[in-house]
Amino acid sequence: MERRAALKGLATAIGGLVVLPSWASNWNHTTLQPTDLLSAEETPLLASVVDTIIPKTDTPGAKELGVDRFIQLMIKDCYDSKAQETLKKGLATVEEDSKETFGKSFTACNAAQRIHILEGMGLSDDATSKGFFTMVKGLTIQGYMSSEYVMTNITKYEMIPARWNGCVPVNQ
């Protein structure tokens, strides 16, 4: 190795170690951008939709397992801007339909009223409504089935799938 390249690399590393703590010390929750895709009004609405799709029974529901946060994260990080707009428009449609049909917010409706609204969206001829319902339902199932609670307590997740237990004893 050349001495000049080694000294240059060493100087860069030392400079980085000196500057990094002062740069990172200014980070806090107010200076970082919010990671949520939805607004403060839309987040509980999505949680209610998710809770309607997989409600709490003798096992925790989708809302309790944080599936609404999973959906936001997936759509924000893995889907395109069209899907993000579909989610926002779909939530607005859910709220509008609820107010038109029952005269109250979707989050204030009982379980039967919520199911009625979501079934109507699933059977709708409107591509945006149907696309929203299909996307949210699929992500709800995916998030619920891949949650820690379901994987460990319901489906009995095995770290080594299809392990082979021989029928002949092995002698050492």
Place the predicted regions along the sequence by residue:
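Sec-dependent signal peptide hydrophobic core
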Residues: 10-15
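Post-signal-peptide N-terminal segment of Sec-exported extracytoplasmic proteins
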Residues: 49-64
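A ubiquitous short alpha-helical element
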Residues: 32-37, 54-55, 78-87
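Mature-region segments of soluble proteins
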Residues: 44-48, 66-172
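C-terminal segment of N-terminal export signals and the immediately downstream linker at the start
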Residues: 1, 5, 18-53
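Short alpha-helical hairpin
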Residues: 22-27, 62-68
